[in-house]
Regions:
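Well-ordered, non-membrane alpha-helical segments in soluble/globular domains
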Residues: 21-23, 50-69, 101-115, 143-148, ...
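Divalent metal-binding pocket/active-site signature
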Residues: 18, 106-193
Length: 280
């Protein structure tokens, strides 16, 4: 991989409590990676049980700490994305006896806290979504309300919203909700996408079949590992070296234009971030 080619992992987790964030970022950089978006892990995986709005800050602050660790390896080339994992609603309702409306209100309050970090410049973007697994109609409705609240915040902040949703290539309804709140479809990013997505920008999991589908489409896309930094699941979902290695593979397969699209054009259009690589 050419040294002046930026390589972005659009969705990666670093765990300062249980994981080895510095080692993970070093592996990414050694493989040719240059830029990272670091997302907070679900609060419960960090040992944080949220009962009130302010409880979300502990997980957010730990994620910022992990991003600062990443910046020691990649100076100025790592950003934080904060929000509330959509699976929290099931944890609250099924395991902790919250009413659905109470769970929704707490999750919306957590997003309000995340929005404060974006407004202060401590985070680049928000994350939200809805469960990717079967839930009741009541939970699905509440989850969509949380998602729309996140879109409203993104519109107010003029920032990107990353989404964790069901496996789908059609988020056109979400794109309509976004437009109603002043958010363009391209600034709604579908995490763990398997190819192009209607109504959002695809952040494609860096597996070969999924990347071929994205590269062949001519649509804007990003690449991600969804790395968990979990010692009990080493390398899950994909290891930190994967995006730079897959970018190299795409070039070898004749998809050089797609690599530029995923790592230069789309990040600039969607996030407005500077992906220049300092000379060595």
């Amino acid at each position: 991989m050419e040294s002046d080619t930026p390589i972005l992992d659009d969705h990666l987790h670093l765990d300062p409590v249980n994981g080895k964030p510095r080692e993970a970022v070093a592996d990414f950089a050694q493989a040719g990676g240059t830029h990272l978006l670091v997302l907070n892990k679900p609060s419960w995986t960090l040992g944080v049980d949220v009962d009130r709005k302010e409880d979300f800050r502990e997980g957010f602050d730990r994620t910022i700490e992990a991003t600062e660790t990443a910046k020691q390896v990649l100076p100025g080339r790592a950003w934080t994305v904060l929000g509330v994992h959509p699976g929290l609603i099931s944890r609250l309702v099924d395991d902790r006896d919250f009413a659905v409306d109470g769970a929704r209100e707490l999750m919306e309050a957590g997003l309000d806290v995340a929005a404060e970090y974006v407004a202060e410049g401590r985070a680049l973007a928000l994350k939200s979504g809805r469960p990717h697994y079967p839930v009741s109609d009541e939970v699905r409705k509440a989850s969509n309300q949380v998602l729309r609240h996140a879109l409203s915040l993104a519109g107010e902040l003029d920032c990107v919203l990353q989404l964790h949703t069901e496996d789908t290539d059609d988020l056109s309804e979400v794109g309509e909700w976004a437009a109603e709140r002043g958010v363009s479809e391209e600034r709604v990013v579908k995490h763990y996408a398997s190819g192009p997505v209607s109504g959002a920008t695809a952040s494609v999991i860096a597996r070969k079949d999924e990347l071929r589908a994205a590269a062949d489409s001519d649509e804007p896309f990003l690449m991600e590992t969804d790395f968990l930094d979990d010692p009990d699941r080493p390398g899950a979902v994909l290891g930190p070296k994967t995006v730079p290695r897959r970018a190299r593979w795409l070039r070898e397969e004749g998809y050089g234009e797609a690599v530029e699209r995923a790592h230069v054009e789309t990040p600039a259009r969607v996030y407005g971030i500077d992906l220049s690589v300092p000379s060595k």
